[in-house]
Amino acid sequence: MNFRNIDWDSLFSYSTIKIVRIRDKRLGILHFAFLIGIILYIIVGTIFLQKKYLVLESPIGSIRTSLMAPSVKPTDLPYCLKNGTDTSYDGYPNKPCQYWDEYLVLYPPSEESSMFITTRCTQETQSTVNGCNLSEPTCVYNTTSSSDFYIANVENFTILLDHTLSAPSLGIQYNGAQLNGQLLDTDGNPMSLPPPNIVGVKGSPDIMSLQGVLTAAGVESLDSQGLANKSRTIRDDGILILCFITYSNTYTYNTGNYHYTYQFKLVQNTKYKIVEPVFTKDVEDRYIFDRHGVRIIFIQTGQLGQFDFQTMLLTFVSGIGLVTAASLIVDIIATRIMPQRSRYQELKFQDSSINNTQKTPTNDHTPLLKDNEDTINENSYQNNSYEK
């Protein structure tokens, strides 16, 4: 191979940018429209609407719940079986009722992010057969008595909700009682409940009755048709509800306004029960509480934001990249689609070479690094002038 015959200048050619001003109103208006659109997108879309100048963090937190029984205990409850009369209510069989307090209704007594409220219980008394010892493989329990009953007036039990939020990277930490809040219905619209329900009042803990929770979840009452078994009521079968606590300080342009919302969602085609064993004097004797009821799971979510200059700068830089794309589109239209595309290509793309000994242009068509003007008509290349 003869290396002297290789055109090293062509092999290692360098492409640089050449600026040509095309005096064509069609291309100018198109490019100007692109620029206006990009500016509106950056300023209005990303800055004002999407708030892309904020650095965001999903909050974490804790939830504490407690239950309280109502002070008034009504005796004329329609779902309670009384002396063999009123054996059904709304087409579903009635059961005897017991008046439990909050310590019996709530099981387990304390949970981190959920709670279970008993609405029906089957209580069984069991002992080992003939007092046998559980070390024997044939020893089993025998049920000596059983009763099935509803918990009276359980829908009027009240729930206290105490929650905290924290965004460690942003240095944000609050208790729910320090913030304004709001209750949303299943469609995300604000709703309010009558007393004793208190939700979103700054300086006061949130208190909701079980009936208030059901209403917010779209359930008319515990005596509505069950979700998993249509022959039973929700009071009889149990139910599962998700409570989303959503935090935000980006709903306005003032990030100092913190706000939270409650939204209860019903999990379809579900029921809920917990079996609680209670041992008495030894493991050979026990009570079994087969509890059905309302299970509420609390989920903390949302986004908190703070102004961050680097985030805003990155948003601007990303938007400026669209300017290059707009110029590329206009260039393609000018050099590939316009009637004068041949002349536009000639002005835009120029192939020049300068040898190492004689630093003079070798291109016979257009002098290098020298301004030139051409007049081009839209059809005959005579009207529009171009400057390099």
Curated annotation (Swiss-Prot):
Gene Ontology BP terms: calcium ion transmembrane transport; cellular hypotonic response; monoatomic ion transport; regulation of calcium-mediated signaling
Annotated GO CC locations: contractile vacuolar membrane
Presence of keyword Ion transport: yes
Ranges per topology, Cytoplasmic: 1-28, 334-388
Deletion consequences: Response to extracellular ATP remains the same in p2xE null strains. Null cells are still capable of osmoregulation and do not show any noticeable differences in their sensitivity to hypotonic conditions. Quintuple p2xA/p2xB/p2xC/p2xD/p2xE null cells displayed slight delay in their osmoregulatory response, but are still capable of regulating their cell volume in water. Extracellular purinergic response to ATP persists in the quintuple null cells with no alteration in the kinetics of the response, but the magnitude of the response is lower.
Region (Pore-forming motif): 291-304
Subcellular location: Contractile vacuole membrane
Transmembrane segments annotated in the record for this chain: 29-49, 313-333
Chief subcellular location: membrane
Alphabetically ordered keywords of this record: Ion channel, Ion transport, Ligand-gated ion channel, Membrane, Receptor, Transmembrane, Transmembrane helix, Transport, Vacuole
Region entry Disordered, spans: 349-388
GO molecular function, one term: intracellularly ATP-gated calcium channel activity
Lumenal side: 50-312
Family: Belongs to the P2X receptor family.
Protein name per the record: P2X receptor E
Upper lineage: Eukaryota, Amoebozoa, Evosea, Eumycetozoa, Dictyostelia
Gene: p2xE
